[in-house]
């Protein structure tokens, strides 16, 4: 880790990503936080850390990340705040009360938190998403990030024909952000398939969520 910290600092790479969608859920994560804090003190790296925490233990999230302070942007993926949508996606969120407690505790310490939504999920409407955003704003979360649904293999959004037909998904291809280059005089582009409409959210409504 010392080697990485030195190389990153010398290359002017200021940030680090934690490749763990449930950080702070197991004891070793607290040790990882202490290690990152020691690297920051010794090498001034990383200056910022992006990671995704688990949802089921607010105390663990707060305590395991406390050492990282303002350097750690805590992402809590809720995807949707609508119960019927969560049922369609076979997902359960942290309780609203616990989410509010986490947001308020982190805000008191001046620590940033990001709530992540995905659009358009099955059963989500423009009205239900706006209601969910208002609910999140009421918790005092620092920022809300709405991600466009990516149609990935290994998920029903790409591989389940019946699921796609049931929810009448419409998709388009787009350039992946920053994933393009010119190699040996040839332009190289990376594209991805994303959802832009369902039977419950028209393309016009989808565009409205992007304003």
Model features per residue range: what roles?
Residues 35, 132-133, 161-165:
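Short, hinge-like loop/turn segments at secondary-structure boundaries
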Residues 202-211:
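Charge-patterned, long linear interaction tracts outside catalytic cores
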């Amino acid at each position: 880790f010392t080697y990485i910290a030195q190389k990153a600092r010398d290359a002017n790479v200021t940030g680090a990503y934690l490749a763990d969608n449930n950080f702070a859920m197991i004891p070793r994560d607290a040790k990882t936080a202490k290690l990152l804090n020691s690297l920051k003190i010794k090498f001034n790296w990383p200056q910022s850390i992006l990671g995704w925490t688990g949802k089921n233990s607010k105390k663990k999230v707060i305590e395991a990340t406390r050492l990282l302070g303002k350097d750690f942007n805590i992402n809590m993926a809720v995807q949707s705040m609508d119960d019927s949508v969560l049922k369609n996606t076979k997902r359960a969120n942290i309780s609203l009360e616990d989410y509010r407690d986490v947001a308020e505790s982190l805000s008191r310490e001046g620590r940033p938190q990001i709530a992540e939504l995905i659009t358009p999920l099955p059963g989500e409407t423009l009205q239900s998403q706006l209601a969910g955003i208002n609910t999140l704003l009421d918790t005092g979360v620092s920022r809300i990030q709405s991600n466009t649904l990516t149609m990935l293999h290994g998920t029903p959004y790409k591989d389940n024909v019946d699921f796609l037909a049931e929810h009448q998904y419409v998709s388009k291809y787009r350039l992946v952000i920053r994933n393009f280059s010119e190699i040996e005089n040839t332009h190289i582009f990376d594209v991805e398939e994303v959802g832009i409409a369902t039977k419950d959210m028209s393309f016009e409504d989808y565009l409205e969520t992007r304003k």
